[in-house]
Amino acid sequence: MQASTISPHLAELEQFNTVNVPESSANINIPSQNSHHQQQQQQQQQQQQQQQQQQQQQQQQQQLQQLQHHNHHQQTSLHPQHTHNGALGYSSLPSEGPKPSFNYDLEIFNLCKQYLNNKNHHGLALIARQKGIPPFLRFKAWPVLLKYHPFVLDPFIQPDNEVINEGNELDSSSSTSSSSSSSSYSSFSKDSGSRNSSSNGTQRLHEQASYNARSDTENRIKKDISRYVQRIFGSLSTELPSLDREILDVIENAVKKFTLKWGKIIKYDLSLLWMALNLAEWIPPLPKTPWVLVGRDQNSHPKLTHNVLDDYTHYIDNIPGLGNYLEELIYNDEHISSLAFHEVYERLVLVLLHCPEPDSRKQTSQNGSTGGKGDVASNDHHNHHNHHHYHHHHQQDQLNKTRLPVTGGTIEERVSFFIFCLRKLLPELSQYFHEEQILSKFGCLDDEWLIWWLKFCGTKAWSKFDRGRIWDFMLGWRLKNPKKNFNYYYEKLNYVNRDTLEKLGPDIFWTLNSEKTERPKMNPRNNSFRDLVHELNCNFHISRADFNQQLQSDSSKSKIVSPASDAPALTIPFSTIDPHVALIFISISLLKSKENTLVELDQHEIRQFLSRLPSKSYEYNHKQRKRLNNNGNDPSSVRSSKPSLPSEEKTLNTIIISNDAQDNKHKINFIDSIINEAGEEWRKWLWTEFVDDG
């Protein structure tokens, strides 16, 4: 589905660079067309040196401001134009404004640091999907996770129908040979002169069409960025500092690079820009700098960028040495990840837009097709073009319900599955949506929120704090390789101890055990959901008990302490269901949490609310601070103080570091609760279908 058309009358920002970026370029900063490679490197080194000097000055200002916060309440934030200095282009002082609610176990945090320092993508993926990556470490952890993500190693994106149709129309209009039979082609090839003439004409036509499409895409990207700036400041005439302009240039060119590489499969869409903008809220577009986009969650004093650490200063201050460690990661580290922003962005899009290969394409590949993933824009589009309706034949519906959780599906199939599950799990809200016609115009602008939720994984529509945690889950998604045993994965996790694994818990979407659960009598031969449950339990579970039967040598036993015979199985949680199917249940869980609010709104208000879902984890903390201010308390006096150091006999198991105010008695992790509730909704749905299918 294509996003709404951008008005061509919006003025463009003059600062944007219009130079086309070659696909082979790996530089973040956009060079001029006439520059040589050596000049590019020198310019980049000079910029990095200047940035390091400027950052040192900025750090001193931040430290001074932090000291002032302990004794004085900050009256107001500086106006955006006054927070930009000439040299650096931007000055971000940590404010005493609202902080996102965030709690994280210290033991798991230290384990995450260990995995990050060693570039252990197995361990990072485990923590990401189970507990989430600490937000201020995402700028280093996400590139590592994306580099080894299964959807990046074996990418497939559902082709856009419009791209396929345009290509077919171009081919048919340029040469009749594209639709002719093999005998016609043989007859045509006898006339070499006619063939060369037609070939040259076709090539020129393709080149002109490609140039026009590229120019149109570049103009659309610029206009969409202009709208984003207007969204932040409320005006197109805002004079942006040089740093902000440079960051936007990097984002713009990252999207250009992606469209140049993947344009034969998917056309440019507003969602592609929003993915880059949302990524830039956690990963600095400029290398060795801390500057990220603020996003929409903090708009009381509009500004475009801030320090990636600003939102979590309370947490960082509570762990000795963490501030220095993070500064080292930002300014000096080249070991963990050196991917450019556009490289991280491309990998992120491949994950968010991933779709399983159609069976027809798999069969073609098995029969000797040499087409790569970039050639998937074939005539398979007839399998997708008619899925914009909710009604399917019973056989197809059964296939979706039993296979979709494992294999995933197209966006049309996922939307249909979402509607089906919503009616099963939240019948009252589903009926209200039906009465208000909230879900009756799929594919139209009225229900655009649903596409932003399911197809684009919360891009634009969700708060950056909630979306960041959900993206952690998706980037950490990993299946167990059935050819690998427990010892292989246990070694990859650096022999993590039993207590830590228990703390990480089972997979959020763990599956019912059909053999041990009491259930009504049913015919096992006709129960397709019994087969699904059995498959999920067999394929995605690995425990220490399974491996103990395979131990043969003393050397392997020496590395793993033998458990007691009555000890519980040591389990490494692997992903159970497709991440985009898991996203469906996360979306249902989000709707459930907002049900009381939604039933009080009309059609227009519901769509507006769901298109810009507020973050409870952020607003709760904000309301808490407002209450303190109304009572006459100084917010600086309730800053989260450093926790008492543990005694020698006290373990890390009881230490939870918080980013919240010290007197906040009702600490919440809203989005973690939503994800856990999504697992409950998944099991509830699976059990219902398991029984009904009997």
From Swiss-Prot:
Keywords: Cytoplasm. Its main location: cytoplasm. One of its GO terms (cellular component) is endoplasmic reticulum exit site. Residues 382-394 have a biased composition (Basic residues). Residues 32-47, 172-199, 635-646 have a biased composition (Low complexity). SUPFAM superfamilies: Ypt/Rab-GAP domain of gyp1p. GO terms for biological process: Golgi organization; protein localization to endoplasmic reticulum exit site. It is found in: Cytoplasm. It comes from the Eukaryota. Residues 24-47, 61-94, 164-216, 359-399, 626-647 are annotated as: Disordered. Residues 407-685 form the Rab-GAP TBC domain. InterPro entries: Rab-GAP_TBC_sf. Belongs to the OCA5 family. This is Oxidant-induced cell-cycle arrest protein 5. It comes from Lodderomyces elongisporus (strain ATCC 11503 / CBS 2605 / JCM 1781 / NBRC 1676 / NRRL YB-4239) (Yeast). The gene is OCA5.
